Amino acid sequence: MEQHKTGTLYLCATPIGNLEDITYRVLRTLKEVDLSAAEDTRNSIRLLNHFEIKTPMTSYHEYNKIDKAYQLVAKMREGKNIALITDAGTPGISDPGEDIVRICYEEGIPVTSLPGAAACITALTMSGLPTRRFAFEAFLPKDKKEHQAVLEELKTETRTIIIYEAPHHLVRTLQELHDTLGGDRRLTICRELTKRHEEKLQMTLADSLSYYEVNEPRGEYVLIIAGRSREEMKKEEQAGWEALSLEEHMAHYESQGIDRKEAMKRVAKDRGVSKRDIYQALLK
């Protein structure tokens, strides 16, 4: 373990289901630190007992994350090393973590992250959907206004979308996504990742609603949804411009104070034709 004037905060990823997914480095760190801060000590004690780890433990969760962060920082100022763990996965990824990390940096406390399990990445890599660019939304917001705002943003999202959902809200969320993104949008539904009853389903949003009419949702879900096609967006945008008369299209830009020459250039680009074609059409 690295030596610093203060202690260090170690972000330790824990298994999302299969205990064999824990890393040697995380196990060593959990044994060597002075204290483990756990999202739910009742859950984490089972993990530590399984690996015969006797390190003292304290709670760090959503409802004490600020006050407790400063208490833990005080201990690290005294030279204590602390490991942060959650019920499953990587701290800070849809779990407590980001606030204490920010506070540690503000207070000059070193932070390091030990790589490991994360349900979002596990699901994405085996989804069969594009992995180069993705948008991780975690659980959709509970606040109604914010919830709707996120759905509206997803309408034009071209990256692969990752959403977490609980079984009792799954059908409602699939219906909202269907209504927002369209029934033909493809997705991969991952359930109970790394566990005995792990399941992956590839289908459209429309098919997913039919499927869950006869299959009761069980377990925790990760939804991997295809982003919107750029080609499709371009075609829709072009169709929108073409629905305007040429004069209306020109007026759209000229009303913004754009001179006629530049307006013709933009209209030509919008319609996928040459500036000369626009000029000649306007002369008729």
Per-range role (PLM):
Residues 58-66, 140-143:
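Conserved helicase motor
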Residues 99-157:
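Class I SAM-dependent methyltransferase SAM-binding "motif I" and its flanking Rossmann-like core
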